[in-house]
Amino acid sequence: MSIFVDETTKVVYQGLTGSQGRFYGLLNRDYGTQVVAGTSPKKAGTDVDGIPVFANVGDAIEATGATASCIFIPAPGVKDAVIEAAGAGITFIVCITEGVPAHDEAWFFNKLRRDFPGTRLLGPNCPGIISPGKANIGITAGHIAKAGGPVGIVSRSGTLTYQALYELQQKDIGVTTCVGIGGDPVPGTSFIDCLRAFEADPETKAVMMIGEIGGSAEEEAADFIKSSMTKPVTSYIAGVTAPPGKKMGHAGAIVSGGKGTAAAKMEALRDAGASVGLNPTEAGELMARVVAEL
């Protein structure tokens, strides 16, 4: 099995007619994802390489039965795009867009929880999600992901998501689903959300978790691992040498006031029983040992 998306998931791309939306929408379709529609208010009635374009998400759902969306809308329009998708009945939204104001993120995070509890948002500012061999929604390179399980991956970092997939592929270890939750301060889907889903998935036997400096998400995940995970977890935390007060790539990747350090996160994870690597390759080697003992 996989979590959140599989070969039956039908996806509408909000922003399919833009350069990035078109590029990745077609790439995802070529991977095997059911990319059934795009939206663009000014280009309704046209198509992108055979994919029909509709004026809005509601029209796309009515025509195609889409249940998921992928957002490639410029940052100022993301708030409206998220609520449009949720209001139309989309149950899984992947938002790739970077630079969404934190105020907007907090607003639609709470709006979804209050008014659309049946809708899950992944992102913003994330690489997306891939269930290898089944579906790829976002910007992850499908050729580095080996299908077949038994490992689930969840990561805050985009590039380290790819590195984790590559490390496992090199060791001939398959992945059920790889989720990039994004590095912004207010992610729609958390480490804990993914850990809980992997724990419930019968085909996922172990989990690799990639964290980074800033915030307390990894410490909270460690508490969940300690209290609720029966499956082994390996981890890597990026930013061991990051100077305090300097943002490292993501809006959420900053050590402030002595909090959010890599050392503190690694200690919390070790205390929870997770195996912690000092670099991505070591994290992959730790997972290889875990898989060998399954």
Roles of regions detected by a PLM:
Residues 1-294:
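Catalytic-core regions of core metabolic enzymes
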